[in-house]
């Protein structure tokens, strides 16, 4: 059962680069420092509430800050080379929470697989990491409607020598396959017939790129967006054309969204109202575009249909 969007983390392979040239290890160290300050400064915000639908929004307004659980994953939520919090989810959170009367956002670092446990244990207030909405996760948290939709793609060596374009190719050509810890792509590969115990699990797309470049694997599977972004500075690897994985024999489209504790329906609903205003005005696309999102990633998918296992 998947715990993470796309992810619990495994030990790194080699030196993990990110697309800014900073190692992921140092990136997470920077996030940790900021997160520690945020946890100290907001320790009383996330106390339990007996109010129906929760009163977290009122408490966040009073505190003036919301703590965002992020996983240090480009482009979803990370600390940039200047030490600033950015990514599609934090930038969207800034806009929406400002509209809701909360002036500041504060990053709290987490391994991807620890985001839901951290949310449930009130380490942070909201998960802002581009987390995929799926039935398993919907049993543990509640989601806003997706702010983006996403297909899959592979990282392969230049020229794609094995001709790998989907999970069926990976199985039929007996390719050495890797993906990220807890990524939904594990399920997609297994559904296509790949033996789960043969999958190399790495922390993220940067480690996946390293593994492909070093020849440890033939292919790494991730989102179309993250794979095309991470290979931009690589002379040895490329991203394949985006494709929809098959789930129960049907093409599946994922959607990423903010996650909230199940008791905080009032906050989730207020967030959704502002999110839909941004969608209607086109401002959502303007916020996400600098992070590599295209109009093809804009979506009308709902959390309700994804929680029910639908994909459009």
Feature map (PLM): residue ranges:
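Short helix-initiation/N-cap motifs at beta->coil->alpha
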Residues: 106-117, 200-210, 214
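Extended ligand-binding regions for polar small-molecule ligands
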Residues: 43, 90-99, 160, 168, ...
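Extracytoplasmic small-molecule ligand-binding "clamshell" domains
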Residues: 50-129, 139
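A ligand-binding cleft/hinge motif common to bilobed small-molecule-binding domains
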Residues: 131-139, 188-191, 218-252
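Flexible hinge/capping segments at coil-to-helix
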Residues: 59, 157-176
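Bacterial lipoprotein signal-peptidase II cleavage site
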Residues: 43-50
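N-terminal secretory signal peptides
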Residues: 1-22, 30-40
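Periplasmic-binding protein-like
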Residues: 149-155, 234-272, 294-312
């Amino acid at each position: 059962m998947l715990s993470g969007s796309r992810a619990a983390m495994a030990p790194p392979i080699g030196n993990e680069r990110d697309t800014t040239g900073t190692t992921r290890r140092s990136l997470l160290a920077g996030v940790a420092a900021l997160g520690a300050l945020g946890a100290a400064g907001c320790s009383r915000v996330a106390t339990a509430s007996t109010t129906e639908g929760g009163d977290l929004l009122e408490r966040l307004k009073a505190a003036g800050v919301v703590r965002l659980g992020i996983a240090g994953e480009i482009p979803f939520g990370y600390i940039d080379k200047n030490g600033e919090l950015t990514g599609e989810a934090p930038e969207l959170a800034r806009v929406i929470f400002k509209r809701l009367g909360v002036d500041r956002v504060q990053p709290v670092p987490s391994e991807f697989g620890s985001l839901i446990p951290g949310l449930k244990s009130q380490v942070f207030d909201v998960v802002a990491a581009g987390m995929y909405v799926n039935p398993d996760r919907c049993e543990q948290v509640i989601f806003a409607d997706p702010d983006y939709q996403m297909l899959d793609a592979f990282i392969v060596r230049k020229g794609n020598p094995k001709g790998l374009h989907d999970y069926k190719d990976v199985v039929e050509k007996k390719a050495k396959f890797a993906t990220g810890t807890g990524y939904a792509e594990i399920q997609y590969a297994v559904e296509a017939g790949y033996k789960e115990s043969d999958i190399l699990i790495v922390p993220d797309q940067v480690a996946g790129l390293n593994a492909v470049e070093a020849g440890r694997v033939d292919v790494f599977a991730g989102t179309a967006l993250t794979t095309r972004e991470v290979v931009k500075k690589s002379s040895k690897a490329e991203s394949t054309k985006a494709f929809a994985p098959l789930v129960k024999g049907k093409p599946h489209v994922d959607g990423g969204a903010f996650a909230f504790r199940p008791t905080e329906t009032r906050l989730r609903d207020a967030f959704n109202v502002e999110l839909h205003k941004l969608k209607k005005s086109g401002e959502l696309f303007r916020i996400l575009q600098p992070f590599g999102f295209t109009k093809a990633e804009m979506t009308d998918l709902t959390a309700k249909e994804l929680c029910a296992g639908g994909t459009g």
